[in-house]
């Protein structure tokens, strides 16, 4: 019987895989290429986190992550036209994956006994790194490097999780509140065009 954290991890994997496959389809990738992009989106953040925490990445011990990505590919193949008509499809699935993976990363780090600042960084890596790899694969400037609030939403959610944990709340409540903080921060930032200031260092050098 999967735990609550594992369920969040599986849902996050599916959501992030959908976001990667959806963008790959827009770039006219074939099915295999789309699967690779979806898989990279889904597992990259967790893999980097686990390597830093000296833990074996989950996809190396359990094929469910590969299966979730395969199901995401089938979902896009079967319902691709519906997904295209649905406004903000990519944004919705990407934000869901971002929120769920952030709390999984924070929770895993805290459970291993790391201090809160490490947990917040690991949560941010878990949530945002997959999107960076995805955008590199499809030759786009990663969202994390644009002026949109992206990784900062992970930081906000990580802090919310830590405060709840510090207050002695149950882990599922910490995950719910932390994930909601990530989700709402991202939604509100996009809705009200809240952005981080752009660093201005003069004109771009001539090539």
Which residue stretches match the model-derived regions?
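Short, structured motif recognition centered on aromatic/hydrophobic residues
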Residues: 36-40, 47-53, 121, 125, ...
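Helix-coil boundary and interhelical linker segments in multi-pass alpha-helical membrane proteins
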Residues: 1-4, 50-60, 104-118, 163-174
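Cytoplasmic-side transmembrane-helix entry/capping segments in multi-pass membrane proteins
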Residues: 32-40, 62-67, 87-98, 122, ...
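N-terminal topogenic module of multi-pass integral membrane proteins
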Residues: 1-53, 58
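Ordered, amphipathic secondary-structure segments that act as subunit-interaction surfaces
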Residues: 71-108
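Intrinsically disordered, low-complexity non-transmembrane regions of multi-pass membrane transporters
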Residues: 1, 194-207
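C-terminal ends of transmembrane helices
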Residues: 17-27, 50, 74-87, 132-142, ...
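Structural signature of hydrophobic alpha-helical transmembrane segments
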Residues: 2-13, 57-71, 115-127
């Amino acid at each position: 019987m999967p735990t609550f954290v594992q369920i969040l991890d599986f849902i996050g994997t599916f959501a992030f895989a959908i976001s990667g496959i959806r963008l790959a389809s827009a770039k006219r990738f074939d099915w295999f290429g789309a699967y690779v992009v979806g898989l990279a989106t889904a597992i990259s953040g967790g893999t980097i986190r686990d390597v830093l925490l000296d833990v074996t990445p989950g996809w190396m011990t359990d094929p469910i992550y590969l299966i979730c990505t395969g199901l995401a590919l089938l979902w896009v193949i079967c319902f691709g036209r519906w997904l295209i008509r649905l406004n903000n499809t990519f944004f919705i699935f990407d934000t869901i994956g971002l929120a769920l993976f952030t709390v999984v990363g924070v929770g895993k780090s805290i459970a291993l006994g790391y201090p809160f600042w490490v947990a917040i960084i690991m949560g941010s890596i878990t949530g945002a790194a997959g999107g960076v790899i995805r955008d590199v694969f499809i030759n786009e400037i990663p969202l994390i490097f644009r002026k949109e609030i992206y990784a900062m939403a992970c930081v906000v959610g990580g802090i919310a999780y830590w405060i709840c944990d510090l207050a002695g709340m149950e882990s599922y409540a910490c995950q719910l509140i932390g994930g909601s903080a990530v989700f709402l921060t991202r939604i509100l930032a996009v809705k009200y065009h809240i952005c981080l200031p752009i660093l201005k260092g003069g004109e771009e050098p001539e090539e």
